[in-house]
Regions:
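N-terminal secretory signal peptides that target proteins for export/translocation
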Residues: 1-7
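A short, Trp-centered hydrophobic/proline-enriched beta-strand micro-motif
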Residues: 42-57, 77-78
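Generic short beta-strand segments
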Residues: 50-55, 82, 161-165
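Edge/loop elements at the starts and ends of beta-strands within beta-rich repeat scaffolds
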Residues: 39-46, 209-213
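Flexible, processing/modification-adjacent segments and terminal tails
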Residues: 28-43, 60, 86-88, 96-173, ...
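Bacterial N-terminal signal peptides
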Residues: 11-22
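Gly/Pro-enriched, hydrophobic low-complexity segments
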Residues: 122-124, 130-137, 151-248
Length: 263
C-alpha cells in the first residue's frame, strides 16, 4: 500500500472513536454545531482494516476488518479478527436503534452469544476499548457544552463536554473532548464515571494533513486497570453497499470483504 492511501485510510481509526473530523474551521461553532459536525463524520457505510496492539509489556497484535453502516437513527458495526491465525474469525456485531444497544459475539466454529445492554462495558477482544465505546457516540448525546480551553502540547483546544440525557443509558456520566479548533481534530477524549474518575482516555498521537483534511493517524487508548491499546488504520473504502445479512449473527461467520476493497 502506498503512503498516500495509508495516510487517508487511517482517518477511520478516529471515525470509530469520534476522532476524525473535517478540515479547517472558518468560524467558532456552538457546542451543538460542533457535535453535529463530529457526528456527521461517523455516518455512512464503510469497510476498514485496522491493527490493534494490546498491552504495554508483551504486546498482542491483532488485525481486524470492520464493516459499518451508521446514521443518526441507527447503527450496525461488525469487528472481525483476521490475524493471528488462532483467533481468526472471532467476531462482534454491535447494533444501535435510537439509544438502545445490543450485540452478538461469535467464536468459531459455531458459538454465538448475545450481548445485552448491561454487557456493553465489556472489553472488545481484550483491548482497552469497550463495546460501548464503539457503538455509542457521545456526540449524539443531548447535552453538549463548551466548558473551557486548554493547550495540548502547545496546540489551543476547545473542551467539549458531552452528557447523556434522560432515557439514554451509559456507563459514563460525561465525556470531554479536547478539540484543536483550527484543524477540528480532537487531540484527547476522556470518559468519566459518576464519581468524576477518568475511566478511559483516548489520545491522538499523530496527525497528518491530507487533501485539506487533518487526520489522526495514530491513537492510544488507556482503559481500566492500566490497559493500553495502540490503534492504526491500514485500509478504508467508503460508500460500501452491504446486504442486510452481513449485520446478522449468521453473517458473523463470513469473513468476506466487499468488492473493490483491495483485500
Amino acid at each position: 500500500m502506498n503512503l498516500d492511501l495509508r495516510i487517508r485510510t487511517t482517518c477511520f481509526v478516529g471515525i470509530c472513536l469520534g476522532l476524525a473530523l473535517p478540515c479547517v474551521a472558518f468560524a467558532a461553532d456552538t457546542a451543538s454545531e460542533l457535535a453535529t459536525k463530529l457526528r456527521a463524520k461517523q455516518s455512512g457505510s464503510m469497510f476498514v482494516r485496522i491493527r490493534m496492539e494490546i498491552g504495554s509489556g508483551e504486546n498482542q497484535t491483532i488485525q481486524i476488518q470492520i464493516k459499518s453502516r451508521v446514521s443518526d437513527a441507527a447503527g450496525d458495526i461488525v469487528y472481525q479478527i483476521l490475524f493471528p491465525k488462532e483467533r481468526k474469525g472471532e467476531s462482534v456485531l454491535l447494533h444501535r436503534s435510537g439509544h438502545k444497544f445490543s450485540g452478538t459475539v461469535f467464536t468459531p466454529p459455531n458459538n454465538l452469544k448475545s450481548i445485552g445492554s448491561a454487557e456493553m462495558k465489556q472489553s472488545l477482544f481484550g483491548s482497552a476499548l469497550s463495546y460501548e465505546d464503539i457503538i455509542d457516540s457521545p456526540f449524539a448525546w443531548s447535552q453538549q457544552t463548551i466548558v473551557g480551553t486548554e493547550d495540548m502540547d502547545g496546540t489551543p483546544c476547545q473542551i467539549l463536554e458531552s452528557k447523556p440525557g434522560k432515557g439514554h443509558t451509559s456507563s459514563y456520566s460525561s465525556v470531554k473532548s479536547w478539540i484543536d479548533s483550527r484543524r477540528l481534530v480532537p487531540l484527547r477524549i476522556e470518559k468519566y464515571d459518576s464519581s468524576g474518575k477518568v475511566v478511559r482516555r483516548i489520545n491522538t498521537t499523530r496527525v497528518l494533513l491530507e487533501g485539506g483534511d487533518s487526520l489522526p493517524v495514530d491513537l492510544k487508548v488507556y482503559g481500566p486497570g492500566g490497559s493500553v491499546t495502540h490503534i492504526t488504520g491500514s485500509r478504508l473504502k467508503r460508500g460500501v453497499s452491504y446486504a442486510d445479512s452481513e449485520f446478522t449473527p449468521e453473517g458473523l461467520k463470513q469473513l468476506n470483504a466487499p468488492p473493490g476493497s483491495g483485500s
